[in-house]
């Protein structure tokens, strides 16, 4: 609740199914855009997989994880018809460097995730062009003080941004606080939501779990993520909201047109009350949620 735009994630599946899903998402987003604002806009596609490390695949099925290649990267880009914004992959897997070059040539953000990489491999990945880390602490080795993981590399290099699931389950509130004190506005709040009716998954203890009890994603809304962030890191609303607005816009290279209130930017706004609850949302100057939705439009 409160979102005016989102990036749709395509999870690891048979490769052709992933391409088809991405194509369908982009086409649906285009059709909705032509009809005028009716809700949050789909900004593009994020592929989470299939170029992942089996050791840290979590709920991504082993048989669908495949080697990376330049050719496969190009197929993913082509399927999105210009709408591929980001891909999460393990930088250490075979073919990752070749795939990454293709993604970067087409302006796709490369995010490291579901990876076994340690600090040195992480620094090499950043040197090659990785600029984001998918869900800090999850799907990667722990942040060991003697043998630091890839997370240490992304914390240290100020060119990067780190995605965080602030639901209190994926990452301890204490670690959320520590990460904020270290990274500040380089944190991007991510919901990591799973489809509510996806077969084989259920909500238990506030998170989405697979049949064997493995955490498979969150049941988190972005407004709750902001409230949690404020509480865990003991920060103001003005500080916390950056993680859900300007930081993600900056990550996908769209901060000149969204993610902040300024002349020339899109009138995509969410309205919050004094208890930090969502009262309504506006997309492209039109109220689409709350306040008698679709009855009010800003004058041009």
Where do the language-model regions lie?
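Divalent metal-dependent hydrolysis catalytic cores, especially in the metallo-beta-lactamase
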Residues: 1-24, 39-53, 80-92, 108-111, ...
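Active-site gating loops and adjacent loop-to-helix segments of metal-dependent hydrolytic enzymes
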Residues: 1-5, 53-81, 124-136, 140, ...
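Electropositive phosphate-/nucleotide-binding environments in soluble metabolic enzymes
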Residues: 12, 19, 66-70, 90-93, ...
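Short, electropositive alpha-helical surface patch
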Residues: 19-34, 100-109, 241-250, 254
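Active-site core of metal-dependent hydrolases
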Residues: 74, 78-197
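His/Asp/Glu-enriched, well-ordered alpha-helical/loop segment
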Residues: 152-161, 180-265, 269-271
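C-terminal cap of metal-dependent C-N hydrolases
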Residues: 250, 260-300
């Amino acid at each position: 609740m409160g979102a005016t735009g989102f990036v749709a994630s395509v999870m690891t599946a048979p490769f052709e199914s992933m391409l088809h899903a991405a194509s369908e998402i982009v086409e649906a987003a285009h059709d909705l855009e032509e009809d005028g604002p009716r809700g949050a806009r789909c900004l593009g596609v994020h592929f989470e997989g299939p170029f992942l490390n089996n050791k840290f695949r979590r709920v991504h099925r082993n048989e669908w994880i495949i080697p990376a290649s330049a050719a496969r990267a190009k197929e993913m880009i082509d399927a999105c018809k210009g709408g591929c914004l980001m891909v999460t992959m393990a930088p250490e897997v075979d073919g990752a460097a070749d795939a990454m070059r293709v993604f970067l040539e087409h302006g796709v953000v490369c995010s490291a995730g579901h990876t076994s990489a340690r600090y040195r491999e992480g620094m090499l990945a950043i040197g090659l062009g990785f600029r984001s880390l998918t869900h800090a602490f999850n799907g990667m080795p722990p942040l060991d003080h003697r043998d630091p993981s890839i997370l240490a590399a992304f914390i240290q290099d100020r060119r990067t941004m780190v995605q965080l699931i602030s639901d209190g389950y994926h990452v301890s509130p204490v670690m959320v606080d520590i990460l904020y004190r270290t990274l500040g506005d380089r944190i991007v709040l991510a919901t990591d939501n799973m489809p509510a009716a996806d077969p084989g998954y259920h909500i238990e203890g506030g998170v989405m779990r697979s049949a064997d009890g493995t955490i498979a994603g969150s049941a988190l809304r972005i407004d709750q993520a902001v409230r949690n962030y404020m509480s865990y890191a003991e920060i103001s609303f003005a500080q916390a909201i950056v993680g859900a607005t300007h930081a993600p816009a900056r990550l996908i290279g769209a901060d000149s047109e969204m993610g902040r209130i300024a002349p020339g930017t899109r009138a995509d706004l969410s309205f919050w009350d004094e208890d930090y609850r969502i009262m309504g949302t506006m997309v492209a100057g039109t109220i689409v949620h709350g306040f008698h939705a679709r009855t009010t439009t800003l004058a041009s």
